[in-house]
Amino acid sequence: VLTAILALSAYIFILSPSLLNLDRNAKADSLNITNVVMQYVKRYYVDKSAVHPKAMLVEGLNRLEQIVDQVLVDFPDGEDGATFEVQVTGEKATFDMSGVNDLDLVTSKLEQVFEFITPHLTDNDLKISDIEYAVLDQMLMSLDQHSGIITPQIYKEFMIETEGSFGGLGIV
């Protein structure tokens, strides 16, 4: 159910004029997609007991470290600890995650992390939106094996591939 909702939201993002006008290499002023997805999870995810905001944040940060070579994420007190550190091209920042018990706080923490790493990224091939989608996908997979999000580009390709019609055989 959540996958269908997220696919629908991706479709809406494709057709939304405000999102179409975004710069493809936009900086992390705000993570619009993250906020929308977290609101969908809060409102529509059926199994509320599976939603663990801090664990979702940790999963997302681990994915961030995997896909962005320059970023290192460390949990000095373990993944259940009160802080985490993010290092990017020699710069390091410590973030508090002791009070992360709500999906709105997860969004806020991710915004802080993206605001920190974005100016230091040197790989021009990486787009902030692609990184955001990958992080979100990992966070949603922590809910259950069927939850995830796809990028608007992949969704658009999927819809084109499944588009079409069947003709009759000419039998009366």
Where are these regions (language model features)?
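Flexible, low-complexity junctional segments that flank or bridge functional domains
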Residues: V1-V172
